């Protein structure tokens, strides 16, 4: 606590203080929207609307109820205030994984006219200090991969790149393409599970899976998997793509409480394009989709097939970690 307190006693950082959900929520939402609105997906826009709804709840009882179990909502962090205006923000979200506690830094944002004054650095330093105080083992954040200024800032503070991921979005009516001859699309079978699980673990590594909505045990065939997604209120459908009796990949559709459902693709680099070019036209023809769908996938992979099918890349993020 003494280390954190010393941050706020510094005259240089007199504008830096902890985020107060009771009075900062609306101003933080405005700042986040200004800085990131153009790159937000439907779920991000829903996130902002919930922040603003919470700002109207003076007691925050409704916000607390919504935030229970939802690790993405900003109930902690730091802001930079000048002249009674919030001009900088950093949200801190706590995650618990087996054997360790992780903090995720989100919504690191500063109004343009206040940039290049060290505000983002001061916010990040304060959050790192608090993470150490809370006995976190690591801190993660995401940054646009082409934002070299931010990447260099975080690198100078001890963050190292861990992954590059692209989020792809598609509206049901925008799906395109015809399936090539020779591909066979079926519901996923129990015999496919071992290979599917291996590919999922490769495409969605454990070190980043904690921040995704992917729970691999929920995709397991049989009663165990059914019980997992039943009690977690998760609805899924899964399809296997084969050619000449060889499994090319497995695609999972997962319903979401947010504005876009999710795809999870289990396929290796050598067959992911063939798998997508077979399964996506099948899904379009059978009209399985009713809502927008989002696919999080390693950057640079399956690009041509996804674009041909009507997907658009929303962003490519560099995932960075600082070990504490």
Describe the residue ranges of each PLM region:
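Conserved beta-strand in the GNAT
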Residues: 75-79, 85-94, 104, 109, ...
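Conserved acetyl-CoA-binding loop-helix of GNAT-fold acetyltransferases
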Residues: 110, 116-129, 133, 138, ...
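Active-site rim helix/loop that mediates acceptor-substrate recognition in acyltransferases
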Residues: 32-82, 86, 210-236
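Conserved N-terminal entry element of GNAT/NAT acetyltransferase domains
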Residues: 1-34, 38, 171-191
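Conserved GNAT acetyl-CoA-binding A-motif
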Residues: 131-142, 286-298
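Conserved catalytic-core motifs of GNAT/GCN5-like acyltransferases
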Residues: 142, 160-173, 312-322
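Amide-forming acyltransferase catalytic core, primarily the GNAT-like/NAT-type
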Residues: 14, 54-61, 160-258
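Conserved active-site alpha-helix within GNAT-family acetyltransferase domains
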Residues: 117, 121, 145-163, 298-315
